[in-house]
């Protein structure tokens, strides 16, 4: 979505990708960027970490977006670029554990963005600005905009488990969340072409579904949006499909959920989008 919104800056834009391959490269190509416009490092895992895994040790969390921030800053300096443009949304600010400020997506949050910018100002300041273009929007608004670009449907991918094979595993909370989000705007035939099956017609995803939707249930530790966005998407998906509903939609409809508030006019003013990148032409309508 960011690449499409910034089309008028195409000639001066580079795509920064760590370990460029598969879906990331294909999306860049669809946006009109050939190999000469794709830059980024190769990232490898220390063999010692793999050996510890073999010994039974668990992996810690990798704040990948923080890795992107610091490494992209180096590339921006080397290539003489003024802006590092991310695509993190307002929804990434929501915490994951009820009653506690625990955010699995901290390195995608406004808090991290502010912290990183402060660090740059204090230690590295040379005019390079790091910001997220999509921060003012909810992920629901981004999805609404994304579906207007069907050329990306065959190539985009956002599943951690399927990242190495450029596929949707269609068996995790992230896949279910994206399926729900898009179900507000797309029919099941189109969604099945993307995911390989109708995820809303699977009883085994009840617990994951409830974690994404219900208050009092902790959200899955995946990069997913807010429960308000999920409820709005489900409401729209149910209206779109009429009386013939897949299992999870039918189950949810029986709870008689209240009509959710529209997010069409949502706009998070706590953002660092600079001028001349004006938001007057970036509304999600």
What kind of feature is each model-predicted range?
Residues 216-260:
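Short flanking/linker segments adjacent to small metal-binding domains or redox-active Cys/His motifs
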Residues 1-151, 178:
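ATP-dependent adenylation/nucleotidyltransferase module used to activate substrates
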Residues 148-167:
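Immediate flanking context of iron-sulfur cluster ligation sites
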Residues 161-163, 191-202:
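Active/binding-pocket-proximal capping segment
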Residues 160, 204-210:
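Predominantly late transmembrane helices and immediately cytosolic-facing juxtamembrane segments
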Residues 165-177:
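Local cysteine-cluster metal-coordination motifs and their immediate loop/turn environment
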Residues 175-191:
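Iron-sulfur (Fe-S) cluster-binding segments and ferredoxin-like electron-carrier domains
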Residues 280-285:
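Conserved small/polar residues in nucleotide/adenosyl-binding loops
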């Amino acid at each position: 979505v960011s690449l499409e919104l910034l089309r008028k800056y195409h000639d001066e834009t580079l795509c920064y990708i760590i370990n460029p391959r598969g879906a990331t490269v294909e999306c860049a190509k669809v946006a009109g960027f050939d190999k000469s416009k794709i830059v980024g490092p190769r990232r490898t895992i220390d063999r010692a970490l793999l050996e510890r895994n073999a010994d039974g040790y668990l992996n810690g969390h990798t704040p990948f977006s923080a890795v992107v921030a610091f490494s992209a800053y180096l590339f921006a300096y080397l290539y003489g670029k003024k802006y590092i443009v991310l695509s993190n949304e307002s929804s990434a600010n929501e915490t994951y554990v009820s009653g506690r400020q625990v955010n699995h997506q901290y390195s995608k949050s406004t808090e991290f963005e502010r912290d990183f910018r402060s660090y740059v100002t204090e230690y590295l300041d040379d005019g390079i600005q790091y910001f997220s273009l999509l921060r003012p929007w909810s992920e629901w608004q981004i999805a609404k905009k994304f579906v207007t670009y069907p050329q990306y449907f065959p190539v985009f991918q956002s599943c951690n488990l399927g990242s190495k094979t450029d596929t949707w595993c269609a068996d995790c909370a992230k896949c279910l969340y994206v399926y729900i989000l898009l179900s507000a705007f797309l029919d099941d035939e189109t969604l099945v072409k993307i995911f390989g099956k109708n995820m809303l017609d699977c009883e085994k995803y009840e617990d994951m579904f409830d974690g994404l939707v219900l208050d009092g249930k902790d959200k899955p530790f995946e990069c997913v949006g807010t429960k308000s966005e999920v409820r709005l998407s489900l409401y729209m998906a149910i209206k779109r499909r009429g009386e013939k509903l897949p299992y999870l939609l039918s189950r949810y409809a029986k709870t008689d959920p209240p009509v959710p508030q529209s997010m069409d006019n949502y706009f998070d003013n706590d953002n660092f989008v600079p001028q001349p990148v004006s938001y007057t032409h970036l509304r999600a309508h």
